[in-house]
A protein has these predicted regions:
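Short beta-strand/loop motif that positions the catalytic acidic residue
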Residues: 53, 58-61, 65
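Active-site nucleophile elbow and catalytic-triad environment of alpha/beta-hydrolase enzymes
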Residues: 34-49, 53-55
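Loop/turn elements at helix/coil->beta-strand transitions in domains of secreted/extracellular proteins
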Residues: 6-9, 54-57, 83-88
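C-terminal catalytic histidine-bearing segment of alpha/beta-hydrolase fold enzymes
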Residues: 74-172
Length: 172
């Protein structure tokens, strides 16, 4: 029996997927090294390789992300639209890069790991964004159920699934 390596769906958060004007320079430097040329970077610009064969995609980002421009997501979503690939694209107004599951528990853990990373004002701002950004897990659950035709008896607890993925380190 043949088995496909193609995923049935993708969930992308803060994706570094464009090598053009909006690329994250540090990511491409780490990936390709200092001697990469434009052709290599172009090859890794995912939005330029979207075809109708691409699996459905759930994409989320925050406009305030100073690490990875939300334009990465806009470019990819537009490429999906043009290719006829089913997708959901959610952009939240507030929130820093890497908010992961965006729960208070997650943020408390981050504060323990790196207490000096954010000023009190930045901490308050992130706390304020948790409710909105944290919606992505529920949105992803509904999207997955619809996209993968998951029956009610196969209920996925989205917060638990995504939290367990985060806790296990599989998100890295």
């Amino acid at each position: 029996k043949e088995v496909s390596c193609r995923p049935d769906a993708m969930i992308l958060g803060y994706p570094v997927i464009t090598s053009g004007k909006y690329r994250n320079e540090d990511s491409f430097l780490a990936l390709l090294g200092e001697d990469s040329d434009e052709e290599e970077r172009e090859y890794l610009s995912v939005e330029k390789h979207v075809t109708e064969e691409m699996p459905p995609c759930f994409l989320w980002h925050t406009l305030e992300d100073k690490t990875v421009s939300a334009e990465n997501g806009y470019l990819f979503a537009e490429a999906c639209r043009k290719a006829g690939v089913p997708y959901a694209h959610h952009v939240f107004a507030e929130g820093a890069h890497g908010m992961s599951v965006a729960t208070e528990e997650w943020f408390e853990q981050k504060l323990k790991e790196r207490p000096d990373k954010w000023t009190e004002e930045e901490q308050a701002h992130i706390y304020g964004a948790l409710d909105e950004v944290g919606m992505w897990t529920g949105l992803a659950k509904r999207w997955l159920k619809r996209t993968l035709c998951i029956k009610e008896r196969q209920e996925i607890d989205s917060e638990d699934f995504i939290y367990q993925t985060w806790r296990s380190g599989l998100h890295k």
